[in-house]
């Protein structure tokens, strides 16, 4: 398993297992390339939607803790 795949799976599992995040099943995690070669880097991207901004913040904090130094981009919509 690629390191990026492992990180993606780990972050998604931790978010889904967190009982304090309502609607965790509506949060999606990906590890994407950002930038132009030869200066590309991997970033962790959070997408989806939640009802409370605190859920988006919690997911972002979890991702940052497990991103292995990668930047986290939080694109979770709050409705």
Regions found by a protein language model. Give the residues of each.
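N-terminal targeting leaders
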Residues: 1-79
């Amino acid at each position: 398993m690629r390191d990026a795949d492992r990180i993606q799976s780990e972050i998604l599992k931790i978010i889904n297992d967190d009982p304090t995040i309502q609607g965790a099943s509506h949060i999606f995690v990906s590890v994407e390339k950002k930038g132009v070669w030869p200066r590309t880097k991997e970033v962790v991207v959070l997408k989806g939607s939640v009802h409370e901004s605190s859920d988006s913040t919690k997911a972002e904090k979890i991702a940052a803790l497990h991103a292995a130094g990668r930047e986290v981009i939080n694109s979770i919509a709050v409705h």
